[in-house]
């Protein structure tokens, strides 16, 4: 990811700082100080497909950028870091007491919780940048509330991917049961 900066929230060596949310539902790991992300081949498949053509069949033949100039930008792909997780239960309960919802179900409403998250961030002077995302989630049926403070990177570039013959070796039957595959793809955030 271009513009990647190492995150330090629970200590500089905290392993959870290396794990990212990759795209729409995968995970990845930061494996270098320059933001190199390792994820599964099937997670990077859309990015590989996006850059494949008749002349450059990266799905069949794989792809490896030999330098940063050869890295390929991946439109629409994001990598998200969770910078902090805050227990905001007391604050949310105070806000709910002031709520005039006649049905009393706002405690689970994502739209309502988003406004509460914004108010909390302002009240606590949480630094918000264009890359910051706040997500307030109810847990245990609304008995606990946690605010996830995230940084989203959207300048993601394809660095490497093995050929599908390696990345999907054994197809789903073997891969899901025995994991014989080299199910990996490299991106830079």
What is each stretch, according to the model?
Residues 1, 65-139:
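N-terminal leader/propeptide and maturation segments of large enzyme subunits in energy/redox metabolism
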Residues 1-13:
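Start-of-domain marker
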Residues 17-34:
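A conserved glycine-rich beta-strand in the N-terminal activation segment of trypsin-fold
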Residues 24, 43, 160-162:
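Short, flexible loop/turn elements at secondary-structure junctions
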Residues 30, 37-39, 157-159:
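Structural recognition of the beta-strand scaffold that forms the well-ordered cores
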Residues 38-82:
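Catalytic-histidine neighborhood of serine endopeptidases
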Residues 113-178:
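Gly/Pro-rich turn-and-neighbor structural signature
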Residues 180-187:
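Conserved small/polar residues in nucleotide/adenosyl-binding loops
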